[in-house]
């Protein structure tokens, strides 16, 4: 997993509450478990005016010009600004895969669905929860300013707005350490490879009958 330390990135405002995982990545794209290649189908039913299918070339598909990610001013955004209950609905790890594959590293909203929230950390995304008034102000500034950017520093747990105001945010210490070091579940396990190997060798010596071919 790619470590996350800090980011100075463009913001895209998705001004919708209760965005569910089927909107983030529709069900027909869940057949693959490669963890990559989902970016072109992120928010597929909102970004395009036709019906998307797996393996389809999205370059020439008809786009919805009103959708935020199709607007030139938000091109290359790495921070997604959201509303309440983002990531609700069915549990699918493909949702954070699609967001990360598109290029997002940070999500900022007033609340996130629990399973989605935890899946973000496991896949290199930083979901940040802020009070609703702070979210409202970020939406106002973002929509009023072309190329609106925020600086997010995980080590200090701060967001710096273009006007210089600093906003503090909370993050679980364990999740923070994992993101800073790029540790996913596999990486965490491999950190204890020597202890696991020692345990397995002792178990084989103590209980050889478990390992009869």
UniProtKB/Swiss-Prot annotation:
What binding partners and quaternary form does the record give? Heterodimer of LeuC and LeuD.
Describe the family membership recorded for this protein in Swiss-Prot or TrEMBL: Belongs to the LeuD family. LeuD type 1 subfamily.
Q: Which CDD domains match?
A: IPMI_Swivel (cd01577)
Q: What is its EC number?
A: 4.2.1.33
Q: What UniProt keywords apply to this chain's record, in alphabetical order? A: Amino-acid biosynthesis, Branched-chain amino acid biosynthesis, Leucine biosynthesis, Lyase
Q: What class of enzyme is it?
A: lyase
- List the SUPFAM superfamilies: LeuD/IlvD-like
Q: Which GO terms describe its biological process?
A: L-leucine biosynthetic process
Task: Name any GO cellular component annotation.
Answer: 3-isopropylmalate dehydratase complex
Q: What is the catalytic activity of this protein?
A: (2R,3S)-3-isopropylmalate = (2S)-2-isopropylmalate
**Metabolic or biological pathway:** Amino-acid biosynthesis; L-leucine biosynthesis; L-leucine from 3-methyl-2-oxobutanoate: step 2/4
List the protein's name.
3-isopropylmalate dehydratase small subunit
Question: What is an example of a GO molecular function annotated in this UniProt entry?
Answer: 3-isopropylmalate dehydratase activity
Q: Which species is this UniProt entry from?
A: Aromatoleum aromaticum (strain DSM 19018 / LMG 30748 / EbN1) (Azoarcus sp. (strain EbN1))
Q: What does this protein do, in the record's words?
A: Catalyzes the isomerization between 2-isopropylmalate and 3-isopropylmalate, via the formation of 2-isopropylmaleate.
């Amino acid at each position: 997993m790619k470590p996350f330390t800090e980011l100075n990135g463009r913001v895209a405002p998705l001004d919708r509450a209760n965005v569910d995982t089927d909107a983030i990545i529709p069900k027909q794209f869940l057949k693959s478990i490669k963890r990559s290649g989902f970016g072109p189908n992120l928010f597929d039913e909102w970004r395009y005016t036709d019906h998307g299918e797996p393996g389809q070339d999205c370059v020439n598909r008809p786009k919805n010009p009103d959708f935020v990610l199709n607007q030139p001013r938000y091109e290359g955004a790495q921070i997604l600004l959201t509303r309440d209950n983002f990531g609700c609905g069915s549990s699918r790890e493909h949702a954070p895969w699609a967001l990360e594959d598109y290029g997002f590293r940070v999500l900022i909203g007033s609340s996130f669905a629990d399973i989605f929230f935890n899946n973000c950390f496991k896949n290199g995304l930083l979901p940040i929860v802020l009070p609703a008034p702070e979210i409202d102000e970020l939406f106002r500034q973002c929509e009023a300013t072309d190329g609106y950017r925020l600086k997010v520093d995980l080590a200090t747990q701060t967001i710096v707005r273009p006007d210089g105001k600093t906003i503090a945010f909370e993050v679980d210490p364990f999740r923070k350490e994992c993101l800073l070091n790029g540790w996913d579940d596999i990486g965490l396990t491999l950190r204890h490879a020597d202890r696991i190997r020692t345990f397995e060798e002792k178990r084989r010596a103590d209980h050889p009958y478990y390992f009869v071919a």
